[in-house]
């Protein structure tokens, strides 16, 4: 069944950045398709965007397009992007384009092709309010019910979900329920029950929880290499190795040794050969060390000496050379830690299995509502 007459929709929002909204979108979309549904996707408003076929597209829309081989036009998947300086132009009256009309036009065209639309928001409910396109505004514009995604704990996710639900309700948007991500079920198996009871006091159904998985919070070395686009000095022994943590090593070697943990990716100036040598030797002395580094991101554009480079190769440790100071390089690494990329096949498969095995997909589908007739 396709066409606007039968199309239904869901809007997936979050309580903030990096709460797991895109992870949930990806997993749910896969689950919808697994049920044989002709599902379509749209990210109505995007803040972080790239160019695909000379057309700007939000990064999350690009991810979904790449993972699921979506054939809809890029402009439908990502109708509105917010580039740098755009907010100022809107406030100063320099933007006259009807952005809401672009979003509705994309919805109408997608609804003609698909029987179910998954709409993904940007950040918390109020993001975009400055230009009149907050998540609450957009959900109201599209007439879509909202599912709110938050992350682990008890008090904080409930507080955040209730706060965001209030803004959606103020715009007349139905809050269909909530999903809580990164829940430590092994440590606190009672959390789902407490979350369900806590949210029920505010009239918000808990639609499920997603257990914490390290691979979903930590990328592989291959993703770091691809995302940083630096000069790879040595690939190391396993590009699919999962990074346990990121350590910035700008102190004396003995202090570094106290701070790095297992499977650490170490961001260190390339001219701190004392630090690099001490950490590299943890792989060369024939002993088992719990804090052996998984790899190096060398900042400052400083290439280590031939002697130290040979140590890295002998130890078979990943190393990439980056321009920029240590802070800016570490910030780039952090951005990569919290994003999913089309090339990360292992992580994507884990997401699909986690969502299908943890959430009641039929119950979530029951929350979908018809796309309004325009």
Predicted segments, located by residue:
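N-terminal phosphate/diphosphate-binding loop that engages ATP/GTP or pyrophosphate donors
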Residues: 3-15, 19, 23-102, 106-109, ...
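Phosphate-binding/switch loop-helix module in NTP-utilizing enzymes
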Residues: 87-130, 136-140
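Flexible, charged surface loops at secondary-structure boundaries
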Residues: 110-113, 256-264, 287-292
């Amino acid at each position: 069944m396709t066409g606007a007459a039968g199309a239904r929709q869901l809007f997936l929002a979050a309580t903030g950045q990096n709460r797991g909204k895109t992870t949930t979108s990806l997993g749910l979309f896969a689950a919808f398709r697994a049920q044989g549904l002709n599902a379509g996707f749209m990210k109505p408003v995007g803040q972080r965007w790239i160019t695909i076929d000379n057309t700007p597209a939000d990064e999350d829309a690009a991810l979904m397009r790449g993972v699921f081989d979506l054939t809809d036009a890029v402009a439908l998947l990502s109708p509105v992007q917010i580039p740098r300086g755009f907010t100022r132009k809107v406030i100063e009256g320099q933007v006259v384009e009807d952005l809401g009309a672009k979003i509705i036009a994309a919805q109408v065209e997608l609804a003609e092709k698909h029987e179910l639309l998954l709409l993904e928001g940007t950040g918390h409910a109020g993001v975009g309010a400055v230009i009149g396109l907050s998540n609450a505004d957009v959900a109201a514009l599209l007439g879509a019910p909202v599912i709110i995604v938050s992350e682990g704990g008890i008090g904080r996710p409930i507080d955040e979900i209730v706060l965001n639900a209030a803004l959606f309700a103020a715009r007349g948007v139905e809050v269909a329920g909530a999903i809580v991500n990164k829940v430590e079920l092994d440590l606190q198996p009672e959390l789902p029950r407490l979350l369900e009871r806590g949210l029920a006091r505010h009239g918000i159904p808990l639609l499920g929880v997603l257990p914490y998985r390290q691979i979903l919070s930590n990328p592989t070395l291959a993703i770091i290499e691809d995302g940083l686009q630096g000069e790879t000095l040595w690939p190391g022994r396993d590009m699919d190795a999962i990074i346990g943590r990121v350590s910035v090593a700008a102190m004396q070697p003995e202090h570094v040794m106290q701070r790095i943990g297992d499977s650490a990716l170490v961001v260190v100036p390339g001219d701190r050969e004392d630090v690099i040598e001490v950490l590299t030797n943890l792989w060369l002395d024939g002993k088992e060390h719990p804090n052996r580094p998984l790899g190096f991101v060398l900042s400052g554009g400083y290439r280590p000496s031939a002697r130290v480079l040979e140590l890295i190769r002998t130890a078979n440790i990943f190393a990439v050379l980056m321009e920029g100071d240590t802070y800016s390089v570490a910030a780039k690494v952090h951005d990569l830690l919290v994003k999913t990329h089309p090339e990360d096949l292992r992580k994507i498969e884990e997401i699909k299995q986690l969502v299908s095995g943890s959430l009641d997909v039929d119950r979530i589908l029951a929350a979908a509502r018809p796309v309004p007739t325009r």
